[in-house]
Amino acid sequence: MTHASNSHPVTELTKELIARPSVTPLDEGCQTLMAERLAAIGFNIEPMVFEDTTNMWARRGNEGPVFCFAGHTDVVPAGDLSRWHTPPFEPTIIDGYLYGRGAADMKGSLAAMIVATERFVAKHPNHPGSIAFLITSDEEGPFINGTTRVIDTLEARNEKITWALVGEPSSTLKLGDVVKNGRRGSLTANLTVKGIQGHVAYPHLADNPIHKAAPFLAELSQTHWDNGNEFFPPTSMQIANINGGTGASNVIPGTLEVMFNFRYSTEVTAEILIERVEALLTAHELDYDISWTFNGLPFLTGEGPLLDATRHAIRQITGYDTDPQTTGGTSDGRFIAPTGAKVLELGPVNATIHKVNECVKIDDLEQLALCYEVILEQLLC
């Protein structure tokens, strides 16, 4: 085992960012560090603070097309510190890997894009179009005051993004083997099924909402929503939480609360899913309240300049072809895509994200910066 230092510029900047314990929604100076680097190469820096969230819109150039790198400085909590090999906010290199919370998600990507942009601007100081950074500290949290608020601000002044590259850790086994060229939509239901509380010995004087809801939940879980298509897998519904009862064994509960989530393809809409669920509730003659939380539309970036440039970059730097996919969770790309921007995600291997001992291969950080630089050259040269 080695604990050698590493002088790669991407690694060094990643270490500086990891050392700032920016647990969501805190930024802890990460954006200030990035802003200093960007201002030095001609970027206009526009902080946007909404409530407890720190955001930054940085732009170099006044003309289109606009290439935007979107990312976040916040990280998830470290969890059980005793299970970490090294302190999560003390970046440490061990056997070619950089350990620390945020190494892969996504401070490595932030550092790689900063260094890539510095190199690109040094070579092409008069590049056409514009380069922008949209950075938030509210991606891992409730995502209320982050990217969505920045996009609202940009839309209000008709400032459009042409291409958005999101630095989420898209890779699976090796850097660049997978890019995300779309994401499924996300829709969450909070359902309350009403009954009548009573003593378990006198069921005729009560109305058990768990018993009433069980056939509905069985049918809900077995419903086939769609077949998906060539870009998206079939729509998935998963029950996430069920809560009913007082904790006592002799009390029939008065209500049952169920939370379930759809990850849906472009073959259906949120409205169709809501209509089908509520029709099912009615068919089972349930007394219920339901509220819906819309978390994002599905989006897809097909063939075109952004996907072409990314494929070319990965092939040139790594020597293999990437696989565009739409699987996985949501990202802040869902807030950017509705503006008409083409959105793609490319970042490090995601095997350790949100886990203890999160890490990234240091060679991947440098390769990621090279990929980002080639993408810039393909789009803005």
From Swiss-Prot:
Active site: 74, 139 (proton acceptor)
PROSITE patterns in the cross-refs: ARGE_DAPE_CPG2_2
Protein name, UniProt field: Succinyl-diaminopimelate desuccinylase
Similarity comment text for this entry: Belongs to the peptidase M20A family. DapE subfamily.
GO BP annotations, alphabetical order: diaminopimelate biosynthetic process; L-arginine biosynthetic process; lysine biosynthetic process via diaminopimelate
Residue positions binding Zn(2+) 2: 105, 140, 354
SUPFAM superfamilies for the chain: Bacterial exopeptidase dimerisation domain (SSF55031), Zn-dependent exopeptidases (SSF53187)
